[in-house]
Amino acid sequence: LIHNWENLKDDLILFLGAGASVGSINESGYSLPNAYELRNQIWSRFILHPSERDAYDFSNLSLMSLEHASTLAEIKSSRRNLELFLAEKFQIQKSLWQHGMLPFLNTKSIFTTNYDNLIEKGFHTVNYGKPLNSIFNNTTSLNSRFIPLYKPHGTIDYPHSKVSEGGFVITQFDYYEIMDTRQKMLESFISDFQNKCVIFIGYSLLDFDIASILYNMARKNKTQCWYAVFPRNDSDVRNMLRDK
C-alpha cells in the first residue's frame, strides 16, 4: 500500500470493522467490547440472576450469537433498557489518534458496522477536508460536498431511534427489519467501487451477506488492489485472503 500510494491516494474507500476501534475506552473507563464480549455482558446483565454473575462460565453459551442473546434480553427486560445498556458501553469522550488521521486520506466514502462515533469525533477534532454525512438507509441523498459515512447497524448518536434511522441493529428481528434496506445501501455503496482502492481496517468479513457482495465485486474489479488490516494479522489469514 505504501509503495503504491501515489497511484491510489485519490481513489480510496474505507471499510471499518470492530478492529478499527481496538484501544478505545468508554466513559466508564472500560475498553469497547467486541461481539462476544458484548454478548457475555448482555447475558450477565439481563439473563443471569445477580447471584450467578461472578461464577458463571460463559463457555456455556458456546457459539450463541450476539443478536440471539440480545433478542432474549429484549424479551426479558425491554427494548429501552437494552438501548441504554448499549449506549453506556459505547459512549466515548474522544477518538483515537488514528481516527483523527482519517480526514487526511481524502477518502471517497466510508462504511462501518460499528456503533461508536470514533470516526465522527476524529473528523470533528481535526476539522479538515469535507465533513461527513451519516447514512443509515437507502433513502438519503448523496451530496458531493460531504463524505458519505454508511452506518447500517446504527450509531451511539441515536440510541432510541428506529433501526432504519440510526437506532441500534442488535437483535435478530432488527436484522430481519433492515435486510432489504441494508442490501440497497450496500448496492449504493459498492456502486462506487469500480476502479477504487478499498482498504478494510479491522473488518473480519464474518457478515456473510456483506462479505459475499464484496467478494463478487472484488472478482469483477481487477483494476485496483484492495488491502486489509487486521489486529490478528497471521500468515494463514493473509494467505487465505490474498487471492480472493
Can you name each region flagged by the protein language model?
Residues 1-197, 201-244:
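Conserved catalytic-core helix/loop/strand module for nucleotide-ribose chemistry
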